[in-house]
Amino acid sequence: MFIVLEGIDGSGKSTQVKLLSKFLAKDGYPCVLTREPGGTSFAESLRSMILHDPIDPMARLLLIVSARVDHYNKVILPALKEGKVVVCDRFIYSTLAYQGYGDKIDLQTILDLHRLSGCLVEPDLTLLLLGSGHKKLGRDNFERMPREYLSNVCMGYEKIARMYPNIHVIKCMGVGRTSEEIVKIVQGKISEKQTSSCR
């Protein structure tokens, strides 16, 4: 089962990824915790350029897709074939939100690049964390973007959530309550998957 957590920086997403993977491991599910951009030595080597270097938006998109291809083929797909639960911090919907709605790159171009590279994959479950507001932390290129850019990304995420039925939108309510809601949704999805596989 492939689970992805999405959201803008400062939404608490990375914290919830760690909490969810701990819950799954405690419940006896073999779990792989990973992130994007990154997850392999090659993808991690591109991460710094993607997040920190002043490069053209299309060049950044191509780096992101390159990192994703390597990550998907070397980490995600093998783990899924072994029957493990993969919990990933960001995946394709981040690219649609940031590069599509933020950088204004045509969405179909982004999808076509993924299709051509063999990683146009919909996760089994995507949890989109929407906070009350963006925290401008200034740690990377995206966090330093103007408020208008970040507003476009947020709007993009909301539009994407309406386009894809496997995305569950979660309003952040503090670490504890948000974690409880995530666990409840994941438990339901796992039960649903187990039931369908028994038919």
From Swiss-Prot:
Nucleotide-binding recorded as keyword: yes
A GO-annotated cellular component: cytosol
Molecular function as annotated in GO: ATP binding; dTMP kinase activity
Gene Ontology biological-process annotations: dTDP biosynthetic process; dTTP biosynthetic process; dUDP biosynthetic process
Physiological role: Phosphorylation of dTMP to form dTDP in both de novo and salvage pathways of dTTP synthesis.
Encoding gene, per UniProt annotation: tmk
Organism of origin: Neorickettsia sennetsu (strain ATCC VR-367 / Miyayama)
Binding site for ATP: 7-14
EC number: 2.7.4.9
Annotated signal peptide: none
Reactions that this protein is recorded to catalyse: dTMP + ATP = dTDP + ADP
Family under the similarity heading: Belongs to the thymidylate kinase family.
Name of the molecule in the record: Thymidylate kinase
Gene3D superfamilies per UniProt: P-loop containing nucleotide triphosphate hydrolases
Keyword annotations: ATP-binding, Kinase, Nucleotide biosynthesis, Nucleotide-binding, Transferase
Pfam families: Thymidylate_kin
